[in-house]
Regions:
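Conserved non-catalytic scaffold segment of RNase H-like nuclease domains
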Residues: 2-110, 132-151
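A short coil-to-beta-strand element that immediately follows conserved catalytic motifs
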Residues: 111-115
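Short alpha-helix plus adjacent loop in nuclease-associated cores
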Residues: 116-136
Length: 152
């Protein structure tokens, strides 16, 4: 996972749903650097959502798992320091989804950062004919690349 760019970060979120503009929120955020060093890894209590059954079926994060945690606001300064000032390359699978949620939560993203969407890279290399959809799940990409995928 190493990179020639020490300011490249990889990120992933888990959320209460698919639409931040409709009130869905971030449940967890993980950020690692180009050498695999963990920079940030936290779960959050949503500010407004009380349940998310469809998302829970996918991400396995229940309301009980996060009910005693703090909201993302408590970590926003740290998140903005990493994504707004340190990171000049941001990599993720369907990363526009993650960045949309982060911005909706109030995070500042370096406007000059290069955004690398590995889902788009996968679809460019392997096409999207398997499902006919724009979105290809990470599990499908892992399977196609021969990775022994087990869901969290």
């Amino acid at each position: 996972m190493s990179s020639n760019n020490p300011n490249r970060v990889y990120l992933d979120t888990e959320t209460t749903g698919l639409h931040p503009e409709e009130g869905d929120e971030i449940l967890s955020l993980t950020i690692v650097d180009a050498n695999g060093r963990l920079l940030f890894d936290e779960r959050f209590k949503p500010k407004h959502k009380k349940e998310w059954p469809e998302a829970q079926a996918v991400n396995h994060i229940s309301p009980e798992d996060v009910e005693h945690l703090t909201t993302i606001d408590a970590y926003m300064e740290q998140i903005c320091r990493i994504l707004g000032r340190i990171a000049d390359e941001i990599v993720g699978y369907n990363v526009a989804f993650d960045i949309g949620f982060l911005k909706a939560a109030g995070a500042t993203i370096n406007p000059d950062a290069i955004i690398i969407d590995t889902m788009q890279e996968f679809m460019d290399a392997f096409g999207n004919s398997n499902t006919g959809h724009r979105y290809q799940p990470l599990s499908m990409a892992a399977e196609r690349l021969g990775y022994n995928w087990t869901s969290a």
